[in-house]
Amino acid sequence: MTTVGDDAPDFTASLVDGDIEPFRLDDRLGDEPVVLAFFPAAFSNTCTDEMEALRDEFDRGDCTLFGVSTDLPHALAAYRTQYELPFGLVGDPDHRAIEAYDVIEDFEHYGVETVAQRAVFVIDGDGVVTYRWLAEHSGQEPDYDALDEAVDEAADEAAA
């Protein structure tokens, strides 16, 4: 289980950020913190509430935010457009990211075996996890104030 103080596991997937392109986490690490917001499924109620909250309440220029789900990139492209999400979405249908971060949830009752557990990680410019939040159930959203504080701390350290 990836936790605070660990080196952030690298992974490859597809990034939807206007176009669909290859994504490698290590290539995105640098001067500012990276936030990975894992969510179970595009177009579902709680996931959309979370992504819209991040869109509306987490508009800051001192970090890079990515939503991460096991959805296919073309589905994420439609989702990103429909909900006007300004941040990139990472499609992880091969489960590399959710396995690396150990945020795997089964939704067998919905006919889907493996999805991302709702979770948020803040990674500093050195690639170290500085914040981790895991949902206790799929309907739970993160504490956005705590996330904001965690990014403030990581951004302040990066600026020092």
Functional labels for PLM-detected ranges:
Residues 1-160:
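Chalcogenol-based redox active-site neighborhoods
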